[in-house]
Curated annotation (Swiss-Prot):
<dbReference type="GO" id="GO:0005737">
    <property type="term" value="C:cytoplasm"/>
</dbReference>
<feature type="binding site">
    <location>
        <position position="175"/>
    </location>
    <ligand>
        <name>NADP(+)</name>
    </ligand>
</feature>
<feature type="binding site">
    <location>
        <position position="258"/>
    </location>
    <ligand>
        <name>substrate</name>
    </ligand>
</feature>
<dbReference type="InterPro" id="IPR006393">
    <property type="entry name" value="Sepiapterin_red"/>
</dbReference>
<dbReference type="GO" id="GO:0004757">
    <property type="term" value="F:sepiapterin reductase (NADP+) activity"/>
</dbReference>
<keyword id="KW-0521">NADP</keyword>
<feature type="binding site">
    <location>
        <begin position="16"/>
        <end position="22"/>
    </location>
    <ligand>
        <name>NADP(+)</name>
    </ligand>
</feature>
<dbReference type="InterPro" id="IPR036291">
    <property type="entry name" value="NAD(P)-bd_dom_sf"/>
</dbReference>
<feature type="binding site">
    <location>
        <begin position="71"/>
        <end position="72"/>
    </location>
    <ligand>
        <name>NADP(+)</name>
    </ligand>
</feature>
<comment type="similarity">
    <text>Belongs to the sepiapterin reductase family.</text>
</comment>
<feature type="binding site">
    <location>
        <begin position="158"/>
        <end position="159"/>
    </location>
    <ligand>
        <name>substrate</name>
    </ligand>
</feature>
<comment type="function">
    <text>Catalyzes the final one or two reductions in tetra-hydrobiopterin biosynthesis to form 5,6,7,8-tetrahydrobiopterin.</text>
</comment>
<dbReference type="InterPro" id="IPR051721">
    <property type="entry name" value="Biopterin_syn/organic_redct"/>
</dbReference>
<dbReference type="InterPro" id="IPR002347">
    <property type="entry name" value="SDR_fam"/>
</dbReference>
<keyword id="KW-0963">Cytoplasm</keyword>
<feature type="binding site">
    <location>
        <position position="200"/>
    </location>
    <ligand>
        <name>substrate</name>
    </ligand>
</feature>
<dbReference type="GO" id="GO:0006729">
    <property type="term" value="P:tetrahydrobiopterin biosynthetic process"/>
</dbReference>
Length: 261
């Protein structure tokens, strides 16, 4: 079990926080933060954010929990999230932690040849590629390098970043692009610790879409089989592993680490 406050005094920005892996991360992250730390929750869904923030504030009164309802699929949403973070005081924080968890699977009912509408592809890439790049870049400028502040960036990745899957053209390309973006960040900014973490197959809303709507019948059967045979990864176990990796701080910056590694 992780020691209380093991991650130190942290200013954390967590996207995609209102459900699934992000919500689980928020609950498991708070006890690892020292009192006085700040957690900014970002998601599209205002009511879910309010509820989560209330739960965390009640359970972990030492952590300042803030939230911002923002659609990261738009430039305005990215700007709103950056403004909300900029209003926070880094103060005595020892660490800036940016967790890029927000993402979508796209229309997996289509095969490659069905993507003939550039706007559909552009909108997908805006939310899944452009927004984490621009959000992270803006936050790193908002909280620049200083001797007493460690800056850490996490990209929630996937096996799909490394391996092609039929009918997942958008998802695979988006995840691959995100991995490379953050690998470049690791090369350019040597003081920033960067982790691409693939949490494994989780029983979330996204996986429901994948196993029911994927166009390729073989892949759809494979995903359904994993669910029926209980081969999904426990979401809390995966979130804990990610936080353990951050706590140990022994990974090579920019590396892609899978839950099964």
């Amino acid at each position: 079990m992780a020691a209380t406050g093991a991650l130190g005094s942290v200013l954390c920005v967590l996207t995609g926080a209102s459900r699934g892996f992000g919500r689980t991360l928020a609950h498991l992250l708070c006890p690892r933060l020292l009192p006085g730390s700040t957690l900014l929750l970002v998601s599209r869904t205002e009511e879910a954010l309010k509820g989560l923030a209330g739960e965390l504030a009640h359970k972990y009164p030492g952590v300042r929990v803030r939230w911002e309802a923002a659609d990261l699929g738009t430039s305005e949403g990215v700007s709103a999230a950056v403004r909300a973070a900029g209003e926070l005081q880094v103060g005595a924080a020892q660490k800036l932690l940016i967790i890029n968890n927000a993402g979508s699977i796209g229309d997996v009912s289509k095969m490659f040849v069905d993507f003939s509408d550039p706007k559909e592809v552009t909108d997908y890439m805006m939310f899944n590629v452009s927004s984490p790049l621009c959000l992270t870049a803006s936050l790193l400028k908002t909280f620049p390098r200083r001797p007493d502040l460690q800056r850490v960036v996490v990209n929630v990745s996937s096996l799909a970043a490394l391996q092609p899957f039929k009918s997942w053209a958008l998802y695979c390309s988006g995840k691959a692009a995100r991995d490379m973006i953050f690998r470049v960040l690791a090369e350019e900014e040597k003081d920033v610790r960067v982790l691409n973490y693939a949490p494994g197959p989780l029983d979330t809303d996204m996986h429901v879409v994948a196993r029911t709507q994927t166009a390729d019948p073989e892949l759809r059967r494979f995903l359904m089989d994993r669910k029926e045979k209980g081969k999904m990864v426990d979401i809390q176990v995966s979130a804990k592993k990610m936080l353990d990796l951050l706590e140990a701080d022994a990974y090579k910056s920019g590396d892609h680490i899978d839950f099964f590694d």
